[in-house]
A protein has these predicted regions:
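Short, well-ordered alpha-helices that flank and scaffold nucleotide-derived cofactor binding pockets
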Residues: 19, 23-27, 48, 83, ...
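Short, hydrophobic beta-strand segments that form beta-sheet elements in well-ordered domains
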Residues: 34-37, 98-101, 142-145
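NAD(P)+-binding Rossmann beta1-loop-alpha1 motif at the extreme N-terminus of oxidoreductases
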Residues: 1-61
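Internal alpha-helical scaffold of NAD(P)-dependent oxidoreductase catalytic cores
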Residues: 44-49, 113, 134-225, 255
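Interdomain hinge/lid region at the active-site interface
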Residues: 221-259
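Rossmann-like NAD(P)(H) cofactor-binding subdomain of soluble oxidoreductases
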Residues: 54-133
């Protein structure tokens, strides 16, 4: 009799995203199987953070004890992981569901496993994972690409975690991921630039952050309530280009901050 169950999930790559999803799934009743990272020490650390699972410092056939395998490695590693897993499992992959968490890559990154009969797909939670605490997943979009059972399992995971599954076609994934990058890390780049400007004119970093946070919060609240166009303020929105020229002249004194 097979030990496989679709409520047991193996995690390959237990960094910020892998740990957060595994911990949340465990809290919702899923069994955590093999947890695979690059070393035994990090695997044990991940299992402690997740609150369950079996640590492995190398790729192992034990992932096949799960019905669902989640690959949460960096994007550049996903194809290599798929190749190694295919070699390890052979025909035992038939009927398994394998998902990766990349926002930019589609299910073709898992082609070696698909060729062996696994149902493959991508499931990307559109959320930021800082590694501190468990991120809020309630209401978060889980962007899903794949077919058949892979898409069904991805939807089930998203709904289990209180997320909103969103289907996306293959060709749209890179542009989708670019949008998310503009909304989070690039946004923080702008905030950091504003912080550095204030530090240049005498603020401490702590004071600069305290000064900027109310502005940032209100801007996001306005965006949530009115949308970007109606929330847009400042000299460009007013057509006050003489003020913009003064901004440019002031910032030209510190070109290294904007290179």
């Amino acid at each position: 009799m097979s030990r496989t169950t679709t409520t047991t999930i193996a995690i390959v790559g237990a960094g910020r995203v892998g740990r957060a999803l595994a911990r949340s799934l465990r809290a919702h009743g899923w069994n955590i199987g093999a947890v695979v990272t690059r070393s035994a020490a990090t695997a044990r650390s991940a299992v402690r953070a997740i609150g369950g699972g079996h640590p492995h410092g190398v790729l192992t056939r034990r992932v096949l004890d799960a019905g669902v395998i989640l690959i949460a490695t960096p994007d550049d590693c996903i194809r290599d992981v798929a190749v190694k897993l295919a070699r390890a499992g052979g025909e035992e992959w038939r009927g398994k569901v394998v998902l990766h968490t990349s926002g930019a890559l589609d299910d073709r990154a898992l082609k070696p496993l698909a060729h062996l009969g696994a149902a493959t797909g991508a499931m990307h939670p559109l959320q930021t994972f800082s590694g501190r605490g468990v991120p809020l997943l309630e209401g978060v979009a889980f962007v899903i690409q794949g077919h058949g059972r892979a898409r069904q399992e991805a939807r089930r995971i998203a709904r289990t975690l209180g997320g909103a599954p969103v289907a996306l076609r293959r060709a749209a994934k890179p542009a989708y991921h670019a949008a998310g990058t503009f909304a989070a890390p690039y946004f923080l780049t702008l905030v950091e630039t504003a912080t550095r400007i204030l530090v240049r004119i005498g603020f401490s970093r702590r004071r600069a952050r305290a000064v900027l946070l109310p502005l940032i919060r209100q801007t996001l609240a306005n965006y949530e309530r009115f949308g970007a166009r109606k929330a847009w303020t400042g000299p460009v929105a007013r057509g006050d280009f003489s003020t913009v020229a003064r901004h440019r002249a002031a910032l030209a004194e510190w070109p290294e901050e904007f290179s």
